[in-house]
């Protein structure tokens, strides 16, 4: 296919136009008074949301070059979402500000490579400062504050996540389900999560999120490598009659058997997903036995004289819901408390008997997985559109609280970055010179962009507020919800340090890439064919056959 090639300033300006469009669409959602965005869907009701990365994923422009700019900024949002689970809008606004300031300097004749070096050095300095100023999370109140801010100032959600973390521990599993009522409820059930995802992406039931979600599934557990599909046929036929989904957790599944399962899944004959069992050797077998206890099933192993081809439905485990993505599998089990408790006691006894610290550690991991349980938040709302928005906010809030537990919290509302702006300027003036200093100044000028946008979305003058905040102590900032300057930590306006750090790093990375672009190669726009002449012999007018 023919390509068009664009050079120099023209290339960078075309990228900038795409970046402007995406940044503006996403930035309207920033802060406590940020607005919503409506996404039109080809099928079903439109989606009304407030989530930066979801909006970014929806934007496709007609112009291929501008679309490349959109894709670059979308990457900053996506990477931040993958690393910290929140802060995608902040990353987009930061990247946009850095690109705008950087392009002005490149147009004026600055060397883009040296500018990028300055941007990278400034970012490295700021990451250290964010870590220095972060405070570890000490109580559930701080967790609730973090969740509240990430969920768009919804205190009920923040409190619910804090309660969930109290019940399942800070490393525990919190899963989301669509509820049946108007209210959002918290429930703690038996369950576990392990670090193995689906063997093939074709098992995903939700292609947008690339997840396989199976309700009320049967669970086949075996420590055997499944090489031939014939071994599975008897049990698959029994399950197909029940109409329920099936999850296979095995040592491995060979290509032939896997291909058969995928084809059956795609044709809708059987809703099935397959996962490799976690761990190795005896430890893998022990973990599979834990799962068998949890799901009220049996581990099909030749050590116990059980063969796959003779498996019956009674030997299979059952669960309330299983969610599988490319990296993890979460099992939410039905009530089976007595058996789980007995299994936990057995593991504790093994821990007392072993002298090896390594074995003790691994047994402790198994105990935590089995005893920790899963906190299930059932999202309630009046309409499906509201439920989808609420679910995205809850997801952000859960990710933000986990990020806060990992790396601590910093003052929120764009305050931390705004306060670091004069600190960076002072450091850069002493340590950098020439165009590297200009690169650092680009970052310094961009640091107030999130705060300015939050203030503007609340109807205030962003530039004035950013300057006022810089003169105040580090913890003080602008509360956009009330329009007052407050101590952010006392007011409960906090962000996870990991979210702020990831957003800054990804924004700087994308800005550096855009500034050092000198040429773009893109597809030529396709010429639209004029409609075929109506009524031609054997043709149905404009219809394609």
Curated annotation (Swiss-Prot):
Pfam families on file: Cpn60_TCP1
EC number: 5.6.1.7
Stored Gene3D superfamilies: GroEL (3.50.7.10), GroEL-like equatorial domain (1.10.560.10), TCP-1-like chaperonin intermediate domain (3.30.260.10)
The keyword Lipid metabolism is assigned to this record: no
A GO molecular-function descriptor: ATP-dependent protein folding chaperone
GO cellular-component term (any): cytoplasm
Record-listed ATP binding positions: 29-32, 86-90, 413, 479-481, 495
Subunit structure: Forms a cylinder of 14 subunits composed of two heptameric rings stacked back-to-back. Interacts with the co-chaperonin GroES.
Annotated NCBIfam families: GroEL, PRK00013.1, PRK12849.1, PRK12850.1, PRK12851.1
Family according to the record: Belongs to the chaperonin (HSP60) family.
Annotated protein name in UniProt: Chaperonin GroEL 2
Organism encoding this protein: Prochlorococcus marinus (strain MIT 9215)
């Amino acid at each position: 296919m023919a390509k068009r090639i664009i050079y120099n300033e023209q290339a960078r300006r075309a990228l900038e136009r795409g970046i402007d469009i995406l940044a503006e669409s996403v930035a309207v959602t920033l802060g406590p008074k940020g607005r919503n965005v409506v996404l039109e869907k080809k099928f079903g009701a439109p989606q009304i949301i407030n989530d930066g990365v979801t909006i970014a994923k929806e934007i496709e422009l007609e112009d291929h070059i501008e679309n490349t700019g959109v894709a670059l900024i979308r990457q900053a949002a996506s990477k931040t979402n993958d690393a910290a689970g929140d802060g995608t809008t902040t990353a987009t606004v930061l990247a946009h500000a850095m690109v705008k300031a950087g392009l002005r300097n490149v147009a004026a004749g600055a060397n883009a490579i040296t500018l990028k070096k300055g941007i990278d050095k400034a970012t490295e300095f700021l990451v250290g400062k964010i870590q220095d100023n972060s405070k570890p999370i000490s109580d559930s109140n701080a967790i609730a504050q973090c969740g509240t801010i990430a969920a768009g100032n919804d205190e009920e959600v923040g409190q619910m996540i804090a309660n969930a973390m109290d019940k399942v521990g800070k490393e525990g599993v919190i899963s989301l389900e669509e509820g049946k009522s108007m209210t959002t409820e918290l429930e703690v059930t038996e369950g576990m999560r392990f670090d193995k995802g689906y063997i093939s992406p074709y098992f995903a039931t939700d292609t947008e999120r690339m997840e396989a979600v199976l309700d009320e599934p049967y669970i086949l557990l075996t420590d055997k490598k499944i090489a031939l599909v014939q071994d599975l046929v008897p049990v698959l036929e029994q399950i197909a009659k029940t109409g329920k989904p099936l999850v296979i957790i095995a040592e491995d599944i060979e290509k032939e058997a896997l291909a058969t399962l995928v084809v059956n899944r795609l044709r809708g004959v059987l809703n099935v997903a397959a996962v490799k069992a976690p761990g190795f050797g005896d430890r893998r077998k022990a973990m599979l036995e834990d799962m068998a206890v949890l799901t009220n099933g049996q581990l099909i192993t030749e050590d116990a004289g059980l063969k796959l081809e003779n498996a019956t439905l009674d030997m299979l485990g059952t669960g309330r819901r299983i969610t599988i993505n490319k990296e993890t599998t979460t099992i939410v089990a039905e009530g089976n408390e007595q058996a789980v408790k007995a299994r936990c006691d057995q593991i504790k006894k093994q821990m007392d008997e072993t002298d090896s610290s390594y074995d003790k550690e691994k047994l402790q991991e198994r105990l935590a997985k089995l005893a920790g349980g899963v906190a299930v938040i059932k999202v309630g709302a009046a309409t499906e559109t509201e439920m989808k928005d609420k679910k995205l906010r809850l997801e952000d809030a859960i990710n933000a609280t986990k990020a806060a537990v990992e790396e601590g919290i910093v003052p929120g509302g764009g305050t931390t970055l705004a306060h670091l702006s004069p600190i960076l300027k002072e450091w850069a003036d002493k340590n950098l010179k020439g165009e590297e200093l200009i690169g650092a100044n680009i970052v310094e000028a961009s640091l107030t962009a999130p705060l300015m946008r939050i203030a503007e979305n609340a109807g205030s003058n962003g530039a004035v507020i950013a300057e006022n905040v810089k003169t105040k102590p580090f913890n003080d900032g602008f509360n956009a919800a009330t329009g007052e300057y407050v101590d952010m930590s006392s007011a409960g306006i906090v962000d996870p340090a990991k979210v702020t750090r990831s957003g800054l790093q990804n924004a700087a990375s994308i800005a550096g890439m855009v500034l050092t672009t000198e040429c773009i190669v893109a597809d030529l726009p396709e010429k639209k064919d004029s409609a075929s002449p109506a009524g031609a012999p054997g043709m149905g007018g404009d219809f394609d056959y």
